[in-house]
């Protein structure tokens, strides 16, 4: 269930960071810092560099986001 007003964009994982954080390059060229959503963490979904993902951005801070889906 997406939050009200969240912006969903696609991107690619550039590098993993500590504490389940990742640097993601969006399709439009911007780089954001993103963490894994709770459901993905709960189901042990692994994310590796170069994976394609969907990131949910808050309209208040476009430099941080939450990874909500990993493409197969």
UniProtKB/Swiss-Prot annotation:
InterPro entries: NA-bd_OB-fold, RNA-binding_domain_S1_IF1, S1_domain, TIF_IF1. It comes from the Bacteria. SUPFAM superfamilies: Nucleic acid-binding proteins. GO terms for cellular component: cytosol. GO terms for molecular function: ribosome binding; rRNA binding; translation initiation factor activity. Pfam families: eIF-1a. Residues 1-72 form the S1-like domain. It is found in: Cytoplasm. Keywords: Cytoplasm, Initiation factor, Protein biosynthesis, RNA-binding, rRNA-binding. Component of the 30S ribosomal translation pre-initiation complex which assembles on the 30S ribosome in the order IF-2 and IF-3, IF-1 and N-formylmethionyl-tRNA(fMet); mRNA recruitment can occur at any time during PIC assembly. Belongs to the IF-1 family. NCBIfam families: infA (TIGR00008). One of the essential components for the initiation of protein synthesis. Stabilizes the binding of IF-2 and IF-3 on the 30S subunit to which N-formylmethionyl-tRNA(fMet) subsequently binds. Helps modulate mRNA selection, yielding the 30S pre-initiation complex (PIC). Upon addition of the 50S ribosomal subunit IF-1, IF-2 and IF-3 are released leaving the mature 70S translation initiation complex. This is Translation initiation factor IF-1. It comes from Corynebacterium diphtheriae (strain ATCC 700971 / NCTC 13129 / Biotype gravis). The gene is infA.
């Amino acid at each position: 269930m997406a939050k009200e007003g969240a912006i969903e964009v696609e991107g690619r994982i550039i590098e993993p960071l500590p504490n389940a954080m990742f640097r993601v390059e969006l399709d439009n060229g911007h780089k954001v810092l993103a963490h894994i959503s709770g459901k993905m963490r709960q189901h042990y979904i692994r994310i590796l560099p170069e994976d394609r993902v969907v990131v949910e951005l808050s309209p208040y801070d476009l430099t941080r986001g939450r990874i909500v889906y990993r493409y197969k």
